[in-house]
Every structure is written in structure tokens, then in C-alpha cells.
Swiss-Prot record:
Belongs to the UPF0173 family. Keywords: Hydrolase. Gene3D superfamilies: Ribonuclease Z/Hydroxyacylglutathione hydrolase-like. GO terms for molecular function: hydrolase activity. HAMAP family: UPF0173. This is UPF0173 metal-dependent hydrolase Haur_4333. SUPFAM superfamilies: Metallo-hydrolase/oxidoreductase (SSF56281). It comes from the Bacteria. InterPro entries: Metallo-B-lactamas, RibonucZ/Hydroxyglut_hydro, UPF0173, UPF0173_UPF0282_UlaG_hydrolase. PANTHER family: UPF0173 METAL-DEPENDENT HYDROLASE MJ1163, UPF0173 METAL-DEPENDENT HYDROLASE MJ1163-RELATED.
Length: 241
């Protein structure tokens, strides 16, 4: 069996391929996503599970369409998944759980974690609340443990996630403005203690000005040797490097 493979689909979208060949997409957004590589569209023709961190359209943009096309289960916090079902996704596909809860799907364990952000979707002039924003701990059969922090600022619970799950890969936003930037992200990595870090949620729009070089500079200030895996949209990385 191959090891876990992680492909960045631009902005905050990721495709995970498990050692068993299962395909899991997180926060799918490709229509209107300026950083989504069109060559990756074929990668989403078949998926085995869909994970959602929160309700903002740059994270749920194509979740409904993809769920209806692939019949894959969709997992996330209860209120968000209730909205997914309300959009026409079959109830048998919908897995709404809550922070601290762990489920098994597509051959992995997925645990919802705390994130500090907001979560809503606009309906005309009204914003619909879609539950708390979250991150995920993803545990794969080859020993790869991914902590996807979700959209967030740095927070103290990250140290607990590091202690409990000992993730070896952290995926975290660095763009600033709507999430933490490089300075806070470096402190997040200090709390978590993972060997590898994959930056995301940067460069899509001018406001998201954080970049991997700035993250490296901040890590140097903290004397951390976390290895930054700076993927290009559409690029895959296999654990362990």
C-alpha cells in the first residue's frame, strides 16, 4: 500500500488519498475559486467522503453538488450538516457530529476540534448561522496524523491537540485578515509540535497576504525546525516525505 497523499486544491481545499486508496475531500470549492487548478477537476469525479470545517462559501462552495454527484457521506458539525441536508443531500449521506466527537469513515478516524472563527452563509441580506467553525484531526492507517486547524486564530487548545493526538502534519491558514497570519501560525506550530506544516488559505485574494516565506521567518525567530511543505495548487505530497 502507498502512504497517505495530500493534494492542495487551492485556497482551503484538500484531497487526501488513504493508504487503502480511499479519496477524502475537505472544504471543496472549485467554481469561482481563482486558485483552483482546472487540471484537478478530474480528481473529484470520485470521492469517498467529504469533510466540512464551517459554512463560509469559500469552504462549502461545491459541497452540495459534489455530494449529490458522488453520493459520498458529508461530515461536519451538526448545524452545518443540517443545512447540507436541507439543500437536498440525502439524509443517509449526512453525518452531523460535534467538537470532541470522533467518527470513522472511508477508513480513517476523524475528530472535530475547536476553531475560533465564524460560520454562516448569506441568503439575500441575511446571514444564516451554521454552527461553530471547526478543525479536524485525521488519523490514517499508515501512522499519518493530520491536524487541520480550520480557519482560526492561534489558541491554547492547540497544545492539547498536540499532546493528545501527536499529529505529524499540521495544515493551517497563514493568509492573515480573515484568519491568523504567519506570526500567529508560527506560535500555533510551536504549541502543536508537528514535524511538517502545510500552509493554506493564502494568496487567493489580495487581503490574504501572508506567505510561506514569512512563516519561515517567524519560525526562525522561535527557533523551530518545523518543515514547511509549501505546495502549489494541484501539487501532491506523500507522507512521510
Amino acid at each position: 500500500m502507498a502512504n497517505t497523499t495530500i493534494t492542495w486544491l487551492g485556497h482551503a481545499s484538500f484531497l487526501f488519498v488513504t493508504p487503502e486508496g480511499k479519496r477524502i475531500v475537505l472544504d471543496p470549492w472549485y467554481e469561482g475559486n481563482p486558485s483552483f487548478p482546472e487540471s484537478a477537476k478530474a480528481e473529484l469525479e470520485h470521492v469517498d467522503a467529504i469533510l466540512l470545517t464551517h459554512g463560509h462559501m469559500d469552504h462549502t462552495g461545491n459541497a452540495i453538488t459534489l455530494a449529490q454527484q458522488t453520493k459520498a457521506p458529508v461530515a461536519g458539525i451538526v448545524e452545518l450538516i443540517g443545512w447540507v441536508q436541507g439543500q437536498g443531500v440525502d439524509a443517509t449521506q449526512c453525518i452531523g457530529f460535534n467538537k470532541g466527537g470522533c467518527i470513522e469513515l472511508a477508513g480513517i478516524k476523524a475528530t472535530l476540534t475547536t476553531a475560533h472563527h465564524s460560520s454562516s452563509i448569506s441568503s439575500g441580506s441575511i446571514s444564516l448561522y451554521l454552527g461553530d467553525p471547526c478543525g479536524f484531526i485525521l488519523e490514517f492507517s499508515d501512522g499519518c496524523v493530520v491536524y487541520h486547524t480550520g480557519d482560526t486564530c492561534v489558541h491554547g487548545d492547540m497544545a492539547l491537540m498536540g499532546e493528545i493526538y501527536q499529529p505529524n502534519v499540521t495544515i493551517l491558514p497563514i493568509g492573515d485578515f480573515y484568519t491568523m497570519g504567519p506570526r500567529q501560525a508560527a506560535h500555533a506550530l510551536k504549541l502543536i509540535g508537528s514535524k511538517f506544516a502545510i500552509p493554506e488559505h493564502y494568496g487567493t485574494f489580495p487581503a490574504l497576504h501572508g506567505n510561506p516565506e514569512a512563516l519561515q521567518s517567524e519560525l526562525n525567530k522561535l527557533q523551530l525546525n518545523t518543515a514547511i511543505v509549501a505546495l502549489q495548487p494541484g501539487e501532491a505530497w506523500t507522507y512521510p516525505a
